């Protein structure tokens, strides 16, 4: 589910350069550092905990027991932040 949601997010937003997924850990690589920093801060303000990596990558590491609805909500927060750019 995470891979499907992130690939859709990438196709909907041109500022995303790449998405990489390993299990439930995912990285969203943005085309520039400013965008990544803004999304990182905005997502945090909306209750989504992420990690900023290498300046232009946001890492998502949800718990293994996350429900599908919670995962969808987290990606929706990122999508909402991206729409404000």
Regions found by a protein language model. Name each.
Residues 1-85:
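Conserved N-terminal phosphate-binding loop of PLP-dependent enzymes in the Aspartate aminotransferase
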